[in-house]
Amino acid sequence: MLKGLRKKASILSLGSMASQQSTSSAINSESNYDKILTQVYDFEIALKAMDYLLDDRTKTGTDLLQNEASKNNNSEQPHAIFPLALGVMEFIEATLGFEPEVMAKAHKTLSEAENASLNNSKYNLKYQLATSMIYPPGTEFQVTFAESTLLNALLMLLTENNGMVESAKALFKLRRAYQTLDAVYKKIKESEPIFNKNLAKLKKEAAMQGNGTKSNSIITTENFSISTVDLPGYSSQTSSTSSLPQDISLMKNLEKIYLMRKSRIEGATLANNVNPERVNLFEDSNSSLTLAKQSNPKYEEQRVDNANNNNNSHDVGEDDSSSSDNEYCDASEEFDIEDTLNLPPPQIHSSAQSVLSSIETSPSSAQNASDNHLHVSTIDEYIHSGVQLCFGILQVVLSLIPPAIGKVLSIVGFRGDREVGLRLLWRTAITCRNVHGELALLFILVFYDGPVQFVDNGFRLPDQGNDKKIISLDNKATVSEAELDIILERPELYTSQLLRRARRMFPHNALWILQEGRMLAAEGDLALATKTMQDFTDDPANEIQMQQAEALLVFDRATIYIYQHEYDNAARDLIYLIDINSWSKAVYLFMAASCYLEKYRMIKMDIISVDNKESEMAKYSSLFDKYLDLALSYVPGHGHNAVGKKGGIGGSNKQMPFDKFLLRKSRHIEARKKKYPNLPTADIVGTSLIHELIYFWNGYNRMSSHDLEIALKLLGYSGAPNSEYSANTNGNLYALIEETEDEAMIRYFLQGITLRQLGSINDGLGLLDNHVISKYVISEPLHQFRFHKMTYSPYIYPTALYEKTMFVWLLRTKNTAKLDVHQAVQESKSWLKRAEIVGEGDYELSNRTGMRIKAAGDRLEQLATL
C-alpha cells in the first residue's frame, strides 16, 4: 500500500514537474493546439454539469457528463475531469445524507477519478501539453488528483465500519492531498507578481486595439472580442484577417470555449431569471475589449468572413492551427472570477434584504471584474479556485480537531490553521463563479450558521463593528487582506450577500433555501425561517430532486419548530424523515417522541389551551409511548427493526453518539418504571428531553425572548417543589415523581443558559455554580483543580465548565468603561482549561463537546491579539 502511494506521489510531484519547462510559450507546438482546446472544453463541460447539481438538476448534469464521455470512448486522449466532476456531485449527495449506498458509489467514482488524473498527468507530460500560461504541463491534473483524493479520504473517514487498514489508507490519502495542495498553493503565491504584470499587459493590448494597433492576445470577430488566453503559445497577430481553414477552425473553437465560459459566469447556461440574449458580461460598455472594438476603424476589415466560418465550422479538437508563440504567464493569489449579472433583485423576503438595503458602500468596478474574467483562462480558474477551496477546507477541518488528536496529526505533517483556511474560503466564495466558489459558500454557511457550533460568536467585544461600513461584495473581482480582516470580524454581515447571489443563480435547489432558513434562525427570526422553508416544500412547482437536500431541510425545519415550541409540526417533519433518509431513524423517532412529551406538558401546565384537556393529554401520552418504543427498535445492535440494516454514518452497524444518548435515557426511564409501576411513561420522565436535545443544535442561541420564557417554564415542570425556578409548589404539583440530584443538575444547567440568553447573567451563573459545578468540582483553583468523576450524564460535566467560560466573559466585558480585554481573556481561558481537563477521554457526545471547547479557545486566542 505504501509503495503504491509513493509511486503516485512521484508521478505528481510538483518539484519534478517544475524541472520541465515552466512557460507554455516554449512548449506548445501547433500540433498540440487541438489537444489543448479539447481539454479546456472538457473542463467547461464539467463545470457546467456541476452547476446543474447546484441548481438541483443532478440528472441533467450527469447525463451531460456521460454523453460527453461517450463521444470520447475511442480517443487516446484521457478525460480525467469527467469522473472527478461526477465524483464531486456524488460526494455532495453522500455527505448531505450519509447514506451507505450513496457513499459507496461516490467512493468508487472518486477512486476512478484518482487513477484518471494520474493518467492524464502523464499524458500531458508526455506530449508537453501546456494548458496554462504559467504552470508546468499536468498541473491541472495535480489539482484534480488532490481534489479527488481529498474527497475520497473524507468519505473513507466518515465510514464508521472501516477497519484499521481502511482508516490508515484514508489518512495517507489525506496527507497526500495536503502535500499536493500545499505545493500548488505555494506556486500560486509565488506567481502572483507575474500574473498581475501580465494581466495588466493583456488589458493594455486590448485597449491598444482602439488605436488601430493589432494585438497578439485578442481576436476580434463579427460578434465578440476573444482572448487567446485559453491557448498558451498562440498568437493572434495575423489570425483575425486570415482566411486559412485551420485558422478559422481554431478561432471558431476558441470562440466556442469563450462563449461557454461567458455563459457559465453569467448564469445564462442554467436559464434562471436571465435572458442570455440580453446579458453580455464581456460586452459591458466599459470593458476594455468593447471599447477597443467600438473605436477601432479597422474592425470591419478584421472580421472573419461569414462564408469562411460557415464552410469551415468544426468542433473543438478537430483541426490543428498554426501561430507564433507568446511569452505570457498567468497566475494569481486570488482567482478573479465574480458574478456580474445584471439581474433583477431576488424574490427573497428575508432579513438579508433589509440588511443590504441599509449598507452604504462605494460601487465595485464591473469593468475590472469583466476584464479579469476575460483574461483568465478556464484552466487557471480551475487551478486557483480548486486549490483555494480544497486547501481552505483542509485547514479549517484540521483546526477543528481536538487538541489531543491534533498534536498527533501534526507530527505526521497535518497542521491546520483556521484563519488561513477561512481566508481562502471567503476569497473563493467572493471571487469565483464556478462550483468551487459555491461549495466554499456552502462550507462558510455551515461553519457560521449551521446547527453545530463550529465558531463561538458569543465571545465578542461590546459595540463591535459598524454596519454602515459594510463592504459590498457585488461584482468584486478581488478582495484584499484588509477587507478579509473586516469580513472575518463580522461574517454574518456578508454571508447574506453571497447567499442572495446563490439564490438568484440557483433558485431550484433546496440547499439554498435550507441555508437561508438557517441564517434567519441564527438572526433570531424563527417564524420567517420556518415560513421560508415550509413555503418552498409546500409549493407544488418546487420538485426537490436531491432527496438528501430535502432531508436536511426538513430536519432543520423541525429543529426550528422545536425552538418555537410548535411540537406537532416538528414531530410531523421528524416522522417524515424516516421515509426519505436512513441517517438515524432512531434519533428522528426519539426526537418526535420527545416533542409529543413536551406537548403533553404544555397542556398539563395550561401553557396552551385545548377544548378537552384530559383527552388531549391522553392523546399525547400515547403518542410519546408509541414513538419512544419505535425509536428504540431502530437503534443499531439493539432493536428488532435494526437487524440486518445499516445505520449510522456510512452505514455501519455501530451506534452513533445520539443512539447511546437515547439508550441511556431509556435505561433511566426503565429504572423509574420499577419505582413507579402505576404511572404512565409520560409521567416518569425527568428533565425535558427535547430541551436537552436542542442544546446540541444550538437552540438556546436562536430562541426569541418569548420562546425562552416558555422554555424556562417547561424546564421547571420536573423541578422539586419550591426549589429555584421549579414550576411545582407543595400545593400545585405537575411532576408526579421525585427530582433526583442528577436530573436537577441537567435542569439547572439548561435553565442557567436560558436565563443568560434572557439577559439575567448573574442569575444564570448562580444556578450553574450552586446546582451544577459545585456538585462535582472539589477544588476550583486551576493549579490544584480537582473534581469527582460522575457518569450519569457524561457530557454535562465538561460542558457546564465551558458555559461558565461564557458567563465569565460576558460579566467581564459588559462594563465598557472598565474593560480589560486581556484580563477577560485570561480568566475565560482558565475556565476553558478546566473544561478541557474534565472533558478528556472518549465519552457520549465527546466530539461535539470537544468542538465547542476548541471553537471557544480559538476565538479567545483571536481576541487576545486585538
From Swiss-Prot:
<comment type="function">
    <text>Inclusion body (IB) resident protein that interacts strongly with lipid droplet (LD) proteins. Involved in LD-mediated IB clearing after protein folding stress, probably by enabling access to the IBs of an LD-stored soluble sterol derivative that acts as a chaperone in inclusion clearing.</text>
</comment>
<dbReference type="InterPro" id="IPR019412">
    <property type="entry name" value="Iml2/TPR_39"/>
</dbReference>
<comment type="similarity">
    <text>Belongs to the IML2 family.</text>
</comment>
<dbReference type="GO" id="GO:0005737">
    <property type="term" value="C:cytoplasm"/>
</dbReference>
<dbReference type="GO" id="GO:0005634">
    <property type="term" value="C:nucleus"/>
</dbReference>
<comment type="subunit">
    <text>Interacts with lipid droplet proteins.</text>
</comment>
<protein>
    <recommendedName>
        <fullName>Inclusion body clearance protein IML2</fullName>
    </recommendedName>
</protein>
<keyword id="KW-0597">Phosphoprotein</keyword>
<dbReference type="Pfam" id="PF10300">
    <property type="entry name" value="Iml2-TPR_39"/>
</dbReference>
<keyword id="KW-0963">Cytoplasm</keyword>
<feature type="compositionally biased region" description="Acidic residues">
    <location>
        <begin position="317"/>
        <end position="328"/>
    </location>
</feature>
<keyword id="KW-0539">Nucleus</keyword>
<feature type="region of interest" description="Disordered">
    <location>
        <begin position="292"/>
        <end position="328"/>
    </location>
</feature>
